[in-house]
A protein has these predicted regions:
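C-terminal helix-cap and adjacent tail motif
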Residues: 3-13, 89, 151-182
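A short N-terminal beta-strand-loop micro-motif at the entrance of redox/enzyme domains
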Residues: 13-28
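Glycine/small-residue-rich phosphate/adenosyl-binding loop
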Residues: 41-111
Length: 182
C-alpha cells in the first residue's frame, strides 16, 4: 500500500474485538516507533505495553479515574501502549529553558504516529489517548523520578467496519507558500 493511501485509510478506533493482538505485531509497531527521529537523537521514549486484562484494569482504574473517566472506553482495548519519556535528557532541558519548547512532546508525537500507521498497515485499529491522569498512570506503571507519562495508544482489532472518515479541511485552507495569508 502506498503511504498516502495508508494515511487516508487510518482513523481512530474506539471499539475493539476480543481477539488478542499477536505480540509480534505489537513488537513490529514498537520497532516502527523506535526508528522515529527525535531532537538531537536523544530517543527519550520508553514504551510500556499493557496486553493482559489485569494490567489494563489496574492501570485504567488509576489513569482513567475522576474527570478522566471519559477515557475508560480504552480499558476494553486488548492493548494499551503507554509512551513515557525521560525528562532529564539534555535536549529536553535546553529546549524548554532556552526556547520554551518541550521537544519530548514532538518526539512522542512522531514515534506514536509511527505506531498507529504501522498498526494500520497490519490491519489493526488504534486511537491516541491524551485524556488521562498522568501522575496516577505513571505511578501505576512504576515510572521513575524524572520520567513522565506523555501519551497512550489503544490498539486492537476493530470490532466494527470502519465508519465514514471525518472531513478534513481542504489544502487551500491550510497550505501557504512563503508567507501566511488570510
Amino acid at each position: 500500500m502506498k503511504f498516502l493511501e495508508l494515511v487516508k485509510r487510518r482513523q481512530s478506533i474506539r471499539k475493539f474485538s476480543e481477539q488478542p493482538v499477536d505480540r509480534e505485531q505489537i513488537i513490529t509497531c514498537i520497532e516502527a516507533a523506535r526508528l522515529a527521529p527525535s531532537a538531537e537523537n536523544v530517543q527519550p521514549w520508553r514504551f510500556i505495553v499493557l496486553d493482559n486484562r489485569q494490567s489494563i484494569e489496574q492501570f485504567g482504574n488509576e489513569a482513567f479515574s475522576g474527570v478522566y473517566r471519559f477515557s475508560r472506553w480504552a480499558m476494553h482495548a486488548p492493548v494499551i501502549i503507554a509512551i513515557a519519556v525521560e525528562l532529564d535528557l539534555l535536549a529536553n532541558r535546553i529546549g524548554k529553558e532556552i526556547q520554551g519548547t518541550q521537544y519530548y512532546l514532538i518526539d512522542v508525537g512522531i514515534a506514536g504516529e509511527h505506531i498507529v500507521l504501522q498498526a494500520e498497515e497490519l490491519g489493526l485499529g488504534s486511537c491516541w489517548i491524551g485524556w488521562f491522569h498522568a501522575r496516577k498512570g505513571a505511578k501505576a506503571l512504576g515510572l521513575l523520578r524524572g520520567m513522565k507519562l506523555a501519551a497512550l495508544i489503544a490498539l486492537g482489532h476493530p470490532a466494527e467496519p470502519r465508519s465514514k472518515k471525518k472531513e478534513k479541511k481542504p489544502l487551500e485552507k491550510i497550505l501557504f507558500f512563503n508567507r501566511f495569508e488570510r
